[in-house]
Amino acid sequence: MLDILLFVHITIAILLIIVILMQRSGSDGISSISGGGNMGVISAKTANNFLTKSTVILASLFLINAIILANLSSQKKPDLVSKINEIEENQVDNSLPIAK
C-alpha cells in the first residue's frame, strides 16, 4: 500500500511540475515551444484556465497524498532490533548439557 501511494506521489509531483512549467508567464513559459504564442485571446484564456485548474487539483492531490503517506509511515511497526532481541530471548542456551 505504501509503495503504491509513493508511486502515485511521484507521478503527481512530475505532472505538477509539467503543468506549472506550461503556464503562461511574462515570457510565455514553456507553452510557447509548441507554438502557443500565436493563440487567439479566447483559446489562450481557455488554456490558461485549464492549466490553473489542473494545478490546483494536482497540488491538492499532492498535499492529501503527502499527509496520507506521513500517517502511514508513522504508524508503529516493530523494528529489526526488537525482533532480534525477541528471538534471542526465545532461543535455548545450547551450552547447557541436555539430559537424555
From Swiss-Prot:
GO molecular function: protein-transporting ATPase activity
Record's bilayer topology term: Multi-pass membrane protein
Transmembrane segments: 1-21, 54-74
One annotated GO biological process: intracellular protein transmembrane transport
Primary location class: membrane
Entry GO CC: plasma membrane
Source taxon at top rank: Bacteria
Pfam families: SecG
Keyword terms of this UniProt record: Cell membrane, Membrane, Protein transport, Translocation, Transmembrane, Transmembrane helix, Transport
Segment forming the signal sequence: none
Protein localization: Cell membrane
InterPro entries: SecG (IPR004692)
Function: Involved in protein export. Participates in an early event of protein translocation.
Similarity comment: family membership: Belongs to the SecG family.
Record's protein name: Protein-export membrane protein SecG
Gene that this sequence comes from: secG
